Regions:
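Juxtamembrane membrane-water interface segments of multi-pass membrane proteins
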Residues: 1-6, 34-51, 119-147, 163-172, ...
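Long, contiguous internal "core" modules enriched in hydrophobic/ aromatic residues
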Residues: 41-89, 94-192
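Short aromatic-rich membrane-water interface segments that cap or initiate transmembrane helices
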Residues: 8-23, 88-110, 177-192, 258-276, ...
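Hard-cation-handling environments
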Residues: 184-243, 270-275
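Hydrophobic alpha-helical membrane-insertion segments
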Residues: 55-76, 148-162, 224-242, 309-330
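C-terminal amphipathic "assembly/sorting" segment characterized by alternating charged
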Residues: 263-401
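Membrane-interface helix-loop-helix modules in multi-pass inner-membrane proteins
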Residues: 1-55, 161-176, 243-255, 259-261, ...
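Hydrophobic alpha-helical transmembrane segments
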Residues: 24-32, 111-119, 194-201, 277-286, ...
Length: 401
């Protein structure tokens, strides 16, 4: 069945898979090598602008690859209608399906956030493993910049998620109900819990970071009030109407697991949207305080509270886990279809895995990635790239004539 499905998918996107994908992949790899190995010669020649341009080209190629592969991914979820005419439409129409652009927006913001928090992780590791004062100051600054990027790009992330789900509902409300109120409702609960935790952790880092900035204490009273709002908003965001796997109570389930009627409004989308808006707004205000403090006061880099680097590492891990989890939710939303209502999954694995099983697989993958990344950073510190020392000229005795 999987062989037939892959054959069908490749036949639907022949130009993309046979020409577009390999070309973009090879070009991106080549430009990446140029970017890495051109730094030293361009730096010596004082031509850093060329290196920046190379970096821009590298990002454009990477984004092009991302957008291109979003086509088949969304085609599997929202194939163009009418479905009986699917074999008569062109490849571009299959790529530019209903969910293609919303997923592009969501992944673009998600990958930008991921990039910022990966800088945080690298800066935090290097800070914790550095002995020299100058190195700790530098990597403290790296963590600060990474958090600045990660938080700034993360702010519109909930809005991108709403745009994507709205398009799903417009295409087929059955998919949306399956995600929000049916078998994947508890998956979304975990997603809400993690997003709320990430917003809280980002604000905690800004708080800890501002304690080493002169005259930043003037913002602390407002930030303390903001933390109260963040906790309330995050709690509302991941509060479900019931803890059943489906919309209806199942046999053997305790009816006390349903919110009382006087609190049922907490599970409505009006409350969720208000909570999300509050989370984003408070984080944005704290972000402004953070930026003003760094511009108007002296930052004592290298003297951050020890909690700071560990918060950055947590943010990086949580972001990777969240990206993997959202991919799981999107894939499972097709239910027992390889391509929704076009190509049915008839394999024994067509069932939706449990929350525990999905969490185990996602966590295993994320831990593997994180351990490998940690090992790469550790090797870079343990065995740094050193330049060969130039041989000093030595005096050679001359024979007297």
């Amino acid at each position: 069945a999987y062989e037939d499905f892959i054959t069908y998918l490749f036949a639907s996107f022949p130009t993309l898979f046979m020409v577009g994908y390999p070309t973009l992949f090879i070009l991106e790899t080549a430009v990446m090598y140029v970017y890495v190995y051109s730094w030293d010669p361009l730096n010596k020649a004082n031509k850093k602008g060329r290196h920046i341009v190379t970096g821009v080209i590298l990002n454009i190629l990477g984004l092009s690859l991302l957008v291109a592969l979003d086509g088949p991914a969304t085609f599997m979820q929202t194939p163009p209608k009418p479905l009986n005419e699917l074999m008569n439409i062109g490849e571009w129409a299959k790529i530019a399906n209903s969910a293609w652009m919303p997923l592009n927006y969501h992944r673009l913001v998600g990958n930008g956030t991921f990039g910022g928090y990966m800088v945080c992780v690298i800066g935090a590791y290097m800070y914790l493993w550095s002995d020299k004062k100058e190195d700790r100051e530098y990597y403290d600054w790296v963590g600060y910049i990474g958090n600045l990027i990660g938080v700034a790009i993360m702010l519109p992330l909930p809005a991108m998620g709403y745009i994507f789900v709205r398009e799903i509902y417009q295409y087929d409300a059955t998919i949306g109900m399956y995600i929000m109120s049916d078998r994947e409702s508890m998956f979304m609960l975990v997603q809400g819990l993690l997003v709320g935790t990430m917003f809280s952790a980002s604000n905690i880092y800004m708080w800890v970071s501002m304690k080493r900035i002169e005259n930043a204490e003037r913002f602390f009273p407002a930030m303390k009030f903001g933390f109260v709002l963040i906790i309330i908003a995050a709690t509302i965001w991941f509060t479900p109407r019931r803890f059943f796997a489906t919309m209806m109570p199942e046999p053997g389930m305790d009816s006390a697991m349903v919110l009382p009627d006087n609190l049922a409004f907490l599970a409505l989308m009006v409350s969720k949207n208000t909570a999300a808006f509050c989370l984003v707004t408070v984080t944005f205000i704290n972000y402004i305080f953070y930026t003003i403090a760094t511009k108007t006061g002296k930052v004592a880099y290298g003297k951050i509270n020890p909690l700071g680097p560990y918060v950055l590492i947590f943010l990086g891990f949580a972001d990777i886990w969240l990206m993997s989890w959202m991919g799981t939710i999107r894939s499972l939303s097709r239910m027992n279809w390889h391509i929704y209502k076009v190509f049915k999954d008839v394999t024994p694995e067509k069932f939706a895995p449990t929350l525990a099983e999905s969490g185990f697989h996602v966590t295993t993958i994320v831990w593997t990635f994180f351990v490998l990344m940690t090992a790469i950073i550790w090797i870079g510190i343990k065995y740094p790239k050193t330049k060969k020392k130039e041989a000093q000229p030595t005096a050679v005795p001359q024979m007297a004539e």
